[in-house]
Amino acid sequence: MKTAVHALSPDSRPETQHQTRKNEEAAPGSPTPRAGREGRKGPASILRRSPQERCGRGDEPRRTTRHVRFREPLEVAVHYIACREPTTAVQAPSRPRPRGGSLLLRLTACILLALALGMCCGQAGPMARALEDFRARLLAALLRLPLAALDCWRCLLQL
């Protein structure tokens, strides 16, 4: 690797094989500067087409493809997605709540109460009374079931 001193000294520069523009104009009978530039090798240009693109098929010119070389870091993209505001969706009108609460919730509460009561009372007598109470509550809930279904049907008809 060359040091900065060698790179800056005029003696370290190799002589170029091609003539400068002033020397070309001064030399009589020399080819035009453009003709001299076509054959020489230089740094690859970012705008220059690749050799595959230069050789076209017949008279039809090939389309050049463009590639995006820059991509956002993942954390920036994730931050952008997380900060996006959600789209405003049209909300349906809220349904009226049932007055008496959920039937399923009531049944579950009765079953849990009966089981808790049965576990607390280890004797047969209190357990029998708890089961009779559970049976009465279950019968009352089953009698309310058709009324709850009728209320649901009316709510659906109002929508």
From Swiss-Prot:
Pfam families to which the protein is assigned, alphabetical: DUF4658 (PF15555)
Chief site of localization: membrane
Record keywords, A-Z: Cell membrane, Membrane, Transmembrane, Transmembrane helix
Subcellular location: Cell membrane
Domain of life: Eukaryota
GO cellular component terms attached to this protein's record: plasma membrane
Keyword Membrane: yes
Record field: compositional bias (Basic and acidic residues): 12-25, 50-63
Record's keyword annotation contains Transmembrane: yes
Region described as Disordered: 1-67
Annotated membrane topology: Single-pass membrane protein
TM helices/strands, residue ranges: 107-124
Protein's name in the database: Nutritionally-regulated adipose and cardiac-enriched protein homolog
Gene responsible for this protein: NRAC
